[in-house]
Amino acid sequence: MTGKFITFEGIDGAGKSTHLAWFAQQLQAKLAPLGKKVVVTREPGGTPLGERLREVLLHERMHLETEALLMFASRREHIAEVIQPALDAGDWVISDRFTDATFAYQGGGRGLAIDRLEALEHWVQQGLQPTKTILFDLAPEIAAARLADARTPDKFEAESAQFFLRTRAEYLRRAAAEPDRFVVLNANRERSDIQKDLENLLATL
């Protein structure tokens, strides 16, 4: 039995990471009687090499194509060392970001040609796609207000409002193009309301 691959997406400040922890806990309770486990991971990162690349990607300035290539290099290692082995074992994987983030941030935000990203996606993922992608949708100005007092921003969090408008637009474009894979949640609500939606989704998986 092959496991399932769930990804959480959204612009910085949308709240996806908070809800991911709760969702993973609920899913593990559901899978435990079946002898399966939930592997929680993130991108960029997820492996020792990926975590080192994460530090470079979040804090070092670089050419936009270099940035995209490093994202996919980290992803190849992540798939080979974490994601695919877990799925092959019948376990479930939940990742805080995956390739949709690269299309949204490097494609939408940075303006990198989508066809170049698609070529890298095809090479690196070899057909692997998430079973379901949960997109936490939030207006950039609200997300920025949430982040203002949270912590010192990394280079992506410090980007302009226009950058995040483009990033959000690309996320929504991808969601509209793949409605069977994406679940779009309004992230500008109370936590309990969002968790209710996630609970309903969990029942369908």
Curated annotation (Swiss-Prot):
GO terms for biological process: dTDP biosynthetic process; dTTP biosynthetic process; dUDP biosynthetic process. Signal peptide: none annotated. The keyword Ligase does not apply. One of its GO terms (molecular function) is ATP binding. Keywords: ATP-binding, Kinase, Nucleotide biosynthesis, Nucleotide-binding, Transferase. It comes from the Bacteria. Pfam families: Thymidylate_kin. Belongs to the thymidylate kinase family. This is Thymidylate kinase. It comes from Ralstonia pickettii (strain 12J).
